[in-house]
């Protein structure tokens, strides 16, 4: 029994150390690519947190990081396009957890005049949402 415990400990450490992403946080990143004088207003919430309002000038980014929950991780975000903040978009910016727990997953949202574009970083961003 003693040797089995050592064996399991060595295997566990080997797997943990060989996979550098096993404890890396997931991230959601917003970039304001709107016109020069347009401010982006962002508010994201989850079941546990309200991350508050963030105002981004052209070219600025806002990001937050977290670990997936064992049940479900979901961040719902509202975006408004300034200066009058009349144009709005609302969507789920991140969904994960449950049976499949993600480590190091990155959701990039590029906010443009014609809509909100999405990528995980490996491909060109694609238009996902339009302004209402």
UniProtKB/Swiss-Prot annotation:
Leader peptide range in chain numbering: 1-20
Gene Ontology, cellular component aspect: extracellular region
Subcellular location: Secreted
Top-level taxon of the source organism: Eukaryota
One GO BP: rejection of self pollen
Pfam families: Self-incomp_S1
Species per Swiss-Prot/TrEMBL record: Arabidopsis thaliana (Mouse-ear cress)
Gene responsible for this protein: SPH8
Primary localisation category: secreted
Protein name, entry field: S-protein homolog 8
Keywords, sorted A to Z: Secreted, Self-incompatibility, Signal
Expression sites (tissue/organ): Mostly expressed in seedlings, stems, leaves and floral tissues, and, to a lower extent, in roots.
Record family assignment: Belongs to the plant self-incompatibility (S1) protein family.
């Amino acid at each position: 029994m003693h040797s089995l415990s050592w064996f399991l400990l060595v295997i566990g450490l080997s797997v943990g150390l060989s996979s550098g992403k096993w404890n890396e946080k997931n991230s959601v990143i917003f970039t304001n690519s709107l016109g020069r004088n347009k401010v982006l207003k962002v508010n994201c919430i989850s079941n546990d947190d309200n991350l508050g309002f963030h105002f981004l000038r052209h070219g600025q980014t806002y990001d937050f990081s977290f670990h997936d929950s064992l049940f479900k991780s979901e961040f719902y975000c509202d975006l408004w396009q300034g200066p009058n903040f009349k144009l709005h978009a609302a969507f789920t910016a991140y969904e994960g957890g449950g049976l499949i727990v993600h480590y190091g997953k990155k959701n990039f949202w590029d906010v443009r005049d014609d809509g909100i574009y999405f990528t995980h970083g490996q491909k060109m961003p694609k238009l996902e949402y339009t302004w209402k």
